[in-house]
Amino acid sequence: MAQEFKLKDVTSLQMKNGEKKEVEVEGVEGGKVLLLKVQDQVHATSSNCTHYGAPLVKGVLTPEGRLTCPWHGACFNVSTGDVEDAPALDPIAKYEVVEKDGAVYVKTTQEALKANRKFLNIKCSSVSEDKVLVIGGGSGTLGAIEGLRGGGYTGKITVISKEGYQPIDRTKLSKALLADISKAAWRQKEFYMDASIDIIEDEAKSIDFSGKTVSTKSGKEYDYSKLVLATGGTPRWLPLDGLKGDLGNVFLLRTLPDAQNILKAVGDNGKKVVVVGSSFIGMEVGNCLASMKNDVTIIGMEEEPMERVMGKKVGAIFRGLLEKNGVKFQMSASVDKATPSKDDSSKVGGVHLKDGTVLEADLVIEGVGVAPATEYLKGNSSVTLEKDGSLKTDESFAVNGLKDVYAIGDIATYPYHGPGGDGSPVRIEHWNVAQNAGRSVAHTINNPGSKPKPFIPVFWSALGSQLRYCGNTVGGYDDVMLQGEPDKASFVAYYTKGETVVAVASMMKDPYMTQAAELMRRKVMASKSELQKGVDIMEIGLPNEIKM
């Protein structure tokens, strides 16, 4: 039963609009709530983001009552607690708040305070004849199915995924080599069963778009009213001897079994590990394995890791962080081949570079990019794939030229309207983007005719320190402005094209990325000239109007 809990050292609800306070709850060990004032009304919510637990008092609060996590871009509506943007899945809790007798109280239960969240409840029985069929089992699927049920959809929802398990936190595969399904899964299977969501282990083979049916490799056929394609990406093998899947202990990293196989090969650690590719997957898994006391070398083609995306100066910061963790680098390098071990010719023993360098290897991990997983659509006369194998969509992620079909995540090329985008087609391989696209499609299905809600792409990475990034450089960038102390890996990097800031990256500077994303949504981000004159984006007020 709900009761009143007194807030420590709070005597009134006198606050300014936009103000946030994290306060302790008397009599509840570890109990905290967040007080916020929006549009002359004080709200009381749980104090931490439901994604990874970031303190929301350090987040960004907008005039209309949107609270954004300082770490990974999750957004909540402070009036309802509902999730507005990925990657959070559960809402924040809302508490009734009262002021009386010179003190302030929240009305709730002790269990609710300790939970520090509101657990999403989407239990229902399918009662309508509509059928949404989702192909894929990743982040986009997660956003779509939870968004559908959370938005009131009562039709049948079926998910076809070849992975054989419910949606997992795929970001932790490379960041932490998480290989336990009980820890990696966002929800237990019962959660989806209670929501009348059928998850089937199978793989799409072909689609009859006119007949609205999907055929699978097991020989079954599924019909649909609406189809959501969320099949993600397929990691690439290098087409080189020993590196195209033809030697043992050479791995890709995309699935839970991939992580399990890498850990099995690593064994008790102390192994020589060669990582081919100095982009995010390679850097993250290399850093993780070095932390486990393995001898790790990362091979990259550029002068600095992630130079094309992040710029040379920022890439050098990342390299320095990993070198402190014991990682070695071979940059500006080209791989020639991998050769077998002298002890076991079925397994890798070395990686050869084109300059003649040979790196000993007990195992090799390739992180050289992914291709859109759309093999089941090749040769289908009803659809035209882009050159990279993706599907072109409109702003609502509806596939061009098809009725009642949506594409999200790694396989979708959609018009980008963020700064510097101007509607240019872009394909973004970010966890947040896929999940937000799934949420957007769910909203469109639940509310036919509604306009899609725009979002700014966000990603993060674990590189010895936590990287945050928002925006996109689809149109390129011509300068990187670094502020802070880059030598201490504490900085904000502004990626500019002309006067426009098209992307922002930060380390140890929360919540600059979050603030930048909100400024971008409202088209009031500082210009390059303003930044050069010393404008601090944390001091720029957020207008009510969203202009994306």
What are these regions (language model features)?
Residues 1-62, 98-109:
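N-terminal pre-ligand scaffold of iron-sulfur
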Residues 28-30, 154, 158, 195-215, ...:
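A Rossmann-like FAD-binding core segment of flavoenzymes
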Residues 51-52, 58, 230-231, 331, ...:
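Short, well-ordered coil/turn residues at beta-beta hairpins
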Residues 55-56, 70-71, 75-103, 107-133, ...:
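FAD-binding core/adjacent interface of flavoenzyme oxidoreductases
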Residues 127-198, 280, 287-313, 515:
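Beta1-alpha1 glycine-rich phosphate/pyrophosphate-binding loop at the start
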Residues 131-132, 411-514, 518:
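Mid-to-C-terminal Rossmann-like scaffold of FAD/NAD(P)H-dependent oxidoreductases
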Residues 245-269, 350-352, 357-437, 530-535:
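FAD-site-proximal beta/loop scaffold in flavoenzymes
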